C-alpha cells in the first residue's frame, strides 16, 4: 500500500519535533521553571548550545530507530537520555546546592538513598514531562504504523551513518573546546551550575 504524502511528511518531521519537545522538557525539569525570562536571558543568547543539544537528541533517535526499527522505543530512549540527567541535576541541586557532575554516576545508589531519606517529591515539570513523553511514544506508534520493513543493507547503512554523525558530534564538537568556543560555549569549571544555566544540562 502506498503511503500518503502527508504521512510521509509527518514521519520525516516527527524525530525533529520530538527531540525539540524533549529538549524543552529537559530544560524545564533542570531549572524548575521555564519562563519568558529563561528564554531571553539564557536560551536565545546561547542558541548554538541548545541547537547542538537538539542535534544530539535527534541523532540518538535516528540511531535507535535504525538499530531497533521500533519508533516508540527510539522515542522513549531519546526522551530518557534527554530528561533523566536533568532530573538528577535538579535533585542534586536541591540536596547539596551543587550541580550534577559526570563522576556523580559512581554514587548513584548512595544518592538514591539520600534522596529517599530527604523526602524529595516529583515536581510538576516532571509529571508533565512523563505524560508528554508517553504521549509522544504512543504517537510514534501510530505515525510509523505500517512502515515497510527495511532490507539489511539500507538498515546497516542508516545505522552506520547515524552512529558516525553521533560520534562526530560528540568527539568532534562536544569534546573539542576550540570548536565549542567558536559556537559561543565557554568552559566554566569553577561554576558548573552557571554553565548549566547558560548552556543546558
PLM region spans:
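Transmembrane and membrane-interface helices of multi-pass
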Residues: 2-196
Amino acid at each position: 500500500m502506498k503511503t500518503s504524502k502527508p504521512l510521509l511528511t509527518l514521519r520525516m518531521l516527527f524525530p525533529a519535533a520530538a527531540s525539540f519537545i524533549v529538549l524543552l522538557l529537559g530544560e524545564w525539569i533542570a531549572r524548575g521553571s521555564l519562563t519568558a525570562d529563561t528564554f531571553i536571558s539564557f536560551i536565545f543568547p546561547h542558541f548554538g548550545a541548545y541547537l547542538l543539544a537538539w542535534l544530539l537528541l535527534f541523532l540518538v533517535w535516528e540511531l535507535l530507530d535504525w538499530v531497533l526499527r521500533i519508533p516508540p522505543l527510539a522515542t522513549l530512549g531519546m526522551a530518557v537520555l534527554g530528561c533523566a540527567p536533568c532530573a538528577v541535576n535538579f535533585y542534586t541541586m536541591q540536596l547539596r546546592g551543587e550541580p550534577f557532575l559526570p563522576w556523580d554516576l559512581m554514587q548513584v545508589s548512595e544518592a538514591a538513598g539520600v534522596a529517599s531519606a530527604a523526602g524529595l517529591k516529583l515536581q510538576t515539570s516532571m509529571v508533565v514531562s512523563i505524560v508528554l513523553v508517553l504521549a509522544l511514544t504512543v504517537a510514534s506508534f501510530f505515525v510509523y504504523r505500517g512502515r515497510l520493513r527495511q532490507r539489511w543493507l539500507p538498515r546497516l547503512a542508516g545505522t552506520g551513518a547515524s552512529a558516525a554523525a553521533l560520534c562526530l558530534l560528540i568527539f568532534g564538537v562536544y569534546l573539542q573546546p576550540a570548536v565549542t568556543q567558536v559556537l559561543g560555549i565557554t568552559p566554566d569549571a569553577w561554576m558548573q551550575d552557571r554553565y548549566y544555566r547558560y548552556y543546558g544540562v
